[in-house]
Amino acid sequence: MKPVKQSLLAAAVLAAFLVPAAPAFAQHAEHVVIAQTTATAKATETGAALRDLWVGHIFWVRNVVVETLAGNKKAAAAAEKEVVANAKQIAGAIQPYYGKEASEKLFGLLAGHYGAAKQYLEATAEGSKAKQDAAVKNLTGNATEIAKFLSGANPNLPFDTLNGLLLAHGGHHLLEIQQLRAKQYAEEAQTWEAMKKHMYVIADALAGAIAKQFPAKFS
């Protein structure tokens, strides 16, 4: 098993162990590699831009988590505004290929993703297992909806593969929240590194699939 696959599977298994209500994260974490295209300068540039946007997503969500757990409502609200702005940028990145309606659809789905993560954060801070379980269900369902949407738009993004990537990403959010809540800072630092690498996998998969679907735009 390749190192990337091992890290994703390990993160998902940890999330499932710490959150028994989320076995789906463990079941779908290991994924097959999406077929890659020969990189052109524009494809490389697009991939780098998507990496930056997806890392921005986890950066600002982490800030929301940190400030919420610290009780700093003003800072948490400021970070949340950045989460929303980042989601609009990620959604906007697909508009040149799929149109405004698709961009707006993706933004709504990304908003749902963040909403479920925030729901889990608040439930964890409150200590409510029932609310945690509800949040996990919402996060899992949202991952499936995003995978359906993107795989439907691009045949180079197999649903099962994309769903696994998104479920593993959700598992990272849960694990990070739990570790920060428990003040397990050294462990969370390792989770953060795994999250960044996973964002690269997702960004590269999206960029490669788009370049393959629209070769004329990348020639």
Task: Describe the residue ranges of each PLM region.
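Bacterial N-terminal signal peptides that target proteins for export
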Residues: 1-10
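C-terminal segment of classical bacterial N-terminal signal peptides
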Residues: 17-25
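N-terminal leader/presequence segments that precede the conserved core
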Residues: 3, 20, 30-31
